[in-house]
């Protein structure tokens, strides 16, 4: 009886402690006089997440409500974690560029011990991120992109052959699916040195596991919220982001590739070759003069994994959305094709590295696509030290507090981009771009922690789109969705329900 009473007292005490902690978290902004919406005890301000609303839609509604409030940031509850939701572009610039040293971390959950694949460059924080970024910085220079360029062109030529075969059978094609297969084959070749054959085989292993890595969730919303709100507790509990099948597949592929290349002394101008080179450097000197060890096998697996996943979905989505808009806007499509004809004439009708770089209007189309269809909805940061917003002493970002910069919402702010739902590549002419601060366009982040692979992603999209526009015309058909319906179940990245069916005709 006494034991039962004692256990009851312990349970009551624990409940009281948990309730107190939760209450303190959920009244964080109220106590500081910062504008915010009252949060749900578990979901915070993420109502409808993965059920009825995308993260983009959640952020857009919140941003629209407060964008005229004159507050540099407002309170937002990412589940139970209080975050500073940035409204003011000058504050975004302070965080991403001017005071970057105080906002280097992202605060995204990873578990290096139980799920080493999650400890990649996109997720890592602190000294680990700085060290790995320094190690990898040489792998994405313009010179290295030039080395990989012929490989991408080779896959693109195979893509054109497949497209001609498809068009001869049926002019109505799901372009979203086809560009996804193209990007899988490009990245599989460049990251793993493997011919994936996704273009011709719908059941190709790399395509299958690429989609599973994006769609399969190891945990439900409750546990996912725990991982975001209480990362240290989640690590103690051994919680992983990736499913066991995903981990096993990528670990096996990378280790087999590394072993084969080292055994047979295979050298290629690709990402995996660069990673192996970093692995075999017992000591390497960083830009700051520091001497460190090369990459471990776990680090190689993690970087190859994120290179594949990030490049696969972002590039294929961008290409698919661009083709959709070009089909709906034939005058823009014609302008891209006319520029392409002029540039190819200057380069002896060859898709050289310099030729692709000269396609300025195509770049504007890609940039406008990334604005209109922002794949990653926000930029995450965490304050290392207490930060008082300049000119607004009431607004303080405390040490350890999360920061959300809502990229997609900023991209649809009519005061920055008039009539934001209209597709206008001219917004990104040199003259128009110069009128906006750099942080008004954030598909790749900004500052020292921007996307390290943006050069590769842009190169892949330019080559794929340029060859498609040269060889085919695209137009809407009865099966073309209008408007596109976005899928709330796609977690973070911008996904759509169904495909993008267009009428495709060979030129």
From Swiss-Prot:
Subcellular location: Endoplasmic reticulum membrane; Microsome membrane
A GO CC term assigned to this protein in UniProt: endoplasmic reticulum membrane
E.C. no: 1.14.-.-
Family statement drawn from the similarity comment of this UniProt entry: Belongs to the cytochrome P450 family.
Keyword Endoplasmic reticulum annotated: yes
Domain of life, source organism: Eukaryota
Name listed for the protein in its UniProt record: Probable cytochrome P450 6a18
Stretch forming the signal peptide: none
Keyword presence, Transcription regulation: no
Cofactor(s) annotated in UniProt: heme
């Amino acid at each position: 009886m006494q034991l039962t009473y004692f256990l009851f007292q312990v349970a009551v005490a624990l409940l009281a402690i948990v309730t107190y902690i939760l209450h303190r978290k959920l009244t964080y902004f109220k106590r500081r006089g910062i504008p915010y919406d009252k949060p749900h005890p578990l979901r915070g301000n993420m109502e409808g997440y993965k059920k009825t609303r995308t993260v983009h839609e959640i952020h857009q509604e919140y941003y629209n409500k407060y964008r005229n409030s004159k507050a540099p940031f407002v309170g937002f509850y990412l589940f139970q974690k209080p975050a500073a939701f940035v409204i003011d572009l000058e504050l975004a610039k302070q965080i991403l560029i001017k005071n970057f040293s105080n906002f280097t971390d992202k605060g995204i959950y990873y578990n290096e011990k139980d799920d080493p694949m999650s400890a990649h460059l996109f997720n890592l924080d602190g000294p680990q991120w700085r060290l790995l970024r320094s190690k990898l910085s040489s792998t994405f220079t313009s010179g290295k992109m030039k080395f990989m360029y012929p490989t991408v062109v080779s896959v693109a030529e195979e893509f054109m052959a497949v497209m001609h075969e498809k068009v001869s059978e049926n002019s109505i094609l799901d372009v979203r699916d086809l560009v996804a297969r193209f990007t899988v084959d490009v990245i599989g070749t460049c990251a793993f040195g493997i011919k994936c054959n996704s273009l011709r085989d719908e059941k190709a292993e790399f395509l299958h596991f690429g989609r599973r890595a994006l769609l399969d969730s190891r945990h439900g919303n409750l546990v996912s919220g725990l991982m975001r709100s209480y990362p240290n507790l989640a690590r103690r509990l051994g919680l992983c982001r990736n499913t066991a099948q995903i981990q096993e597949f990528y670990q096996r592929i990378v280790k087999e590739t590394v072993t084969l290349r080292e055994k047979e002394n295979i050298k290629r101008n690709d990402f995996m070759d660069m990673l192996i080179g970093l692995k075999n450097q017992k000591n390497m000197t960083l830009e700051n003069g520091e001497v460190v060890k090369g990459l471990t096998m776990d680090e190689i697996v993690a970087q190859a994994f994120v290179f594949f996943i990030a490049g696969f979905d972002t590039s294929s989505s961008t290409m698919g959305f661009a083709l959709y808009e070009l089909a709906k806007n034939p005058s823009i499509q014609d302008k891209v094709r006319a520029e392409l004809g002029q540039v190819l004439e200057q380069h002896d009708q060859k898709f050289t590295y310099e030729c692709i770089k000269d396609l300025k209007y195509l770049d504007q189309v890609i940039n406008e696509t990334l604005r209109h269809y922002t794949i990653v909805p926000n930029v995450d940061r965490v304050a290392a030290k207490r930060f008082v917003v300049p000119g607004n002493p009431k607004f303080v970002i405390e040490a350890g507090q999360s920061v959300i910069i809502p990229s997609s919402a900023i991209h649809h702010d009519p005061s920055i981009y008039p009539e934001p739902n209209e597709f206008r590549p001219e917004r990104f002419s040199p003259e128009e771009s110069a009128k906006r601060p750099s942080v008004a366009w954030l598909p790749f982040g900004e500052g020292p922690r921007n996307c390290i692979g943006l050069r590769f992603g842009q190169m892949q999209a330019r080559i794929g789109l340029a060859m498609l526009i040269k060889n085919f015309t695209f137009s809407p058909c009865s099966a073309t969705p209008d408007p596109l319906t976005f899928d709330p179940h796609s977690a973070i990245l911008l996904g759509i329900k169904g495909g993008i069916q267009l009428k495709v005709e060979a030129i």
